[in-house]
Amino acid sequence: QENQEQAHNLGIYPVQIDQVETSGFSSKIAWMGIAITYGDYIAAIDSLKTTKDIEYKITTTISKIINAQDNNRQQLYEVGYITGHGEHALRSNPYAQSFTELGCEGLRNLLSDIYSIKEINLAEEEIPASLKSIIINGPVMPFSDEELNKISSFISNGGNVLFFIDPLKELPAEQNSMPQYTANHTGLETILDGFGISIEPKFVFDDKCVIQYQNTGKQIFNWAPIVEKNNVAKKHPVTKNLGGIIFYTMGPVSIDESKAKNAVILAKTSDKSWATDENIILYPGYVNPPSDSTEFGPRNIAVAVQDSSKIVVVSSSIITTDILIRSEESATELFVKNAVDYVNDNDDFCEMRTKGTRLDFISIKSEWAALAIKLLNEFGLALVVVIIGFIAWRMKITRQYLITQKYNPDDERMIAKKSDSKNNGEQND
């Protein structure tokens, strides 16, 4: 009873578990959790029903309470989130009519176990010196010179920035017409240029992309490329162990190597990708690949630069919205969270979170092979069961015959079988 009260005081609560015994199933009450204390702070990891991610959970919990104790503040790391230029709101928006109106409630929830997000309107306030990083997510309106100077000053003083910048912005569509797109000029281009990075005002399309099978047929989403392990930086904390990352409406990222000496390409599209700013219709069946084969080739879509500060540039903000951020299981969500960890100097969290993950997609180049795998998946198990059952039945009959022949050869059934076999042999002769 004393231990139960102590566990309750530490924030660990009982759960009912079912276990299999010789007499059947039984239920028991168990306290499965870990309590960590440091100074005046106590943190609990409750309901540990599995060892999955336990190292990551323990390490991040220890880091949070050390951060709180040593800095005499809240346990969560604080991250700045720039607002005032049409950036995505940190709440869901079920009535969104365009990409720019999509909400990021999923992003807030994704980061909530480690980070608290502080919204900052640069037109009204400075960037707090206590922040390690800021996120600039999907601006579609220009920054003033004063606001750009605040960002540059923050970077010069060792601050880190995570940019999610869209290459094109959607113009209001006229009635019964398709959306139009134009270059997304925000003024941040001057800051990125200082690091040798620029985003071309085009969308990247890729044949290695999200494909959905519906009653109407195969739906190909060329503007949602899938980046596999062979096209990510395998040793960088953000992308190590990751593959099968789904991106969305990305732009080509160019790197000036004379300025970006420490640049790392985090992700690039496949050899079957191309970029364009003409006749853009983001609807399956309306994407036309170029006729010139020289226009195909990999495009950089995410880059990191580390000098006195850490800069991560992702050429789309849509991957942070509720379209793709829904739980914490997909490679896209892990990529986004790793990027936030990286600019907050929590590189160790990245590797622990993705350790042992198998998130790459199976590469099937032939449609016939895909059909064969589909049929095998649907009917293969049933076929195997039938074959095994037939083999077991034949083995049982053979075993019965051998036992009877050895121990009871005078059995009338044995004599009849031998007689039938002999007669069949004579007829064949």
Q: Residue spans of the language-model regions?
A:
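Short, surface-exposed patches at the edges or C-terminal ends of soluble domains, predominantly
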Residues: Q1-D429
